[in-house]
Amino acid sequence: MGKTPDWSRLEAYAGSMSKAEFEQAWQQIYSEKNGLPPPFKFTDTHLEVPTGQLAKTTCRIPFRADKEASTSDQKPSWRRARDLPPLEERPPLSDLHIALDPGHIGGSWAMMEERFLSFKPGEDIREGDLSLLTAKILKERLVKEGAIVSLVRESLDPVTTKRPADFEAESRKVLTDAGFPTPAASYQGLTGDAKLLTVQWQSEKLFYRVSEIHARGERVNQQIKPDVVLCLHFNAESWGDATSPQFSPKNHLHVLVNGCYSPGELQQQDVRFEMLLRLLSRVHEEEIPLATTVAESMARVTRLPAYLYSTPNARQAGSNPYVYARNLLANRLYECPVVYLEPFVMNHEETYHRLRGQHFLGRTLIGGKLVTSAIEDYVNGIVRGLLSYYQTNRPS
């Protein structure tokens, strides 16, 4: 479902980056930590990328010599902190355009998304609802600090105009190509892997995991054009059977930036193009320090420990234990710095009850303990992190 790349967009970065800069970004951020060689090559003079297209099989981007000035006039649509206008005693986030992307959809779609959690009849939490509430409260706080704020999703409705039924043909092809030529149409009464091997499940996945994110990408890149996107999520640990979920003793926080591409992912021409577009536009130079500052603030406010990845699909980005590089569709498609937040474990018992309380100020009694609102902590952590970063790095 990806778009056919316009390789001329990469060629516009000719002479903008030295080989040393490219190699450092590739080795420290965009590649797997101990990954195999990528499906492109770079020499002392240029980067050479197979396009996967017959009309033009290779895209060639010259490097600039180490001591030469950049010969590219290519400018991204987003602005670094240092490129914002001087504050001149205005509110600290003045001129900064922030897009808030509330994760998932919520509402009646939450069960389909598998982001619906209930430990007792008549009560539940839905990640899409919680992320939208967090975004609306966060928007109010950021606007008070002078920011221009846009919501990527403004309601409990999908951004995409497509629906699961629109993907039945693609789903049948996916299953047929995988060796299942006669898949069941519905997963009614099925569980586990049997559920995954149905046209219904595959169609729903293409709807909410792929089509929805592509629609948000179009909105971000073509309409909003922000300086930064904050993707707001809540984490979860495995809770077992959805009809009889289990609480988890774990509660943690981590923040993601884009990176850590596997050679298999880069075999896809759209993924290869999107990764190189981010690398050559130097989005990581703003994204990682911004994410690090926000992560430090979130850690102070929430007092959550850092999540530890044990799988190869993520790697630490810099020295902060809370910040990881990972290749996700949202943080790859959005053509600007993206800070992707994953605080709190929804099926941690105290967190579950804090989130059921929605948003409140001060402290309230939960489980015999006075606690703050998890959403209020989430919002405060982000606001303090953004204030710290932009007050330090933009012209005064």
Segments predicted by a language model, with ranges:
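Mature extracellular/periplasmic domains of secretome proteins
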Residues: 213-226, 244-248, 328-333, 338
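Sec-exported extracytoplasmic/periplasmic mature domains
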Residues: 136-147, 221-225, 234, 295-304, ...
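Active-site-adjacent mobile loop/cap segments within catalytic or ligand-binding domains
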Residues: 238-239, 256-263, 268-285, 289-291, ...
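Active-site histidine-acidic residue metal-binding/catalytic motifs
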Residues: 84-219, 238, 248-252, 259, ...
